[in-house]
């Protein structure tokens, strides 16, 4: 069953000095493993990306520096980074305030392998990445993985923007898992057959075959970061 996650209420644990992390997804998700990582000013986290997995990082609040494979990239707020398997990755926070990151492994370690991202480390800021209009659906999309962005068969990731009357009807993915991280506005989301209102600071996730739908709850629109894992997903509408 799909779940609603509120980041402020998660059970954070200290992963390194000045670094706390907590899981978003649970054992019901087999294709992706997601967590929130909070990095204090001047703190750093170093770890390896497992073989067979892509690592995705999104700066939800604040900025960060991501280093690995003899490359270092500065990430502004709302920037998406893609990191190749086997990379020894270091994330640091050079800024004055705490940085909050959304971290995703697709798939988790020791999973069946699919061709993944092979470009080392790349990053794309929301503010400078092309926006693709989908007039028939009253949506805009900003692609980070797939659709001409970073190439991988392990996931599809994008920011989606709705206007006030955009509606995505109930549907499910029989061959993929989904996660939504809310960035702006209030969204009316059908989770487990019930409508809930979600906003920034929250996420929803759905195991394979779990029905969900969404629309703007109030105001002029919403935006959210959306993952489907793996990339070759099928959508079945009610």
Segment roles from a protein language model:
Residues 1-33, 46, 96-155, 169, ...:
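A short, N-terminal "cap"/entry segment at the start of jelly-roll beta-barrel domains
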Residues 56, 70-85, 193-209:
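Short acidic-glycine-tyrosine-enriched beta hairpin
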Residues 49-51, 94-96, 155, 172-173, ...:
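Short glycine/proline-enriched turns and hinge-like loops at secondary-structure junctions
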Residues 94-95, 197-199, 210-221:
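Catalytic core of Fe(II)/2-oxoglutarate
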Residues 63-65, 88, 98, 186-188, ...:
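Structural motif
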Residues 38-39, 49-66, 159-163, 172-189, ...:
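Short, conserved beta-strand element in jelly-roll/cupin
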Residues 44-46, 50, 79-81, 85-91, ...:
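Histidine-centered metal-chelating micro-motifs
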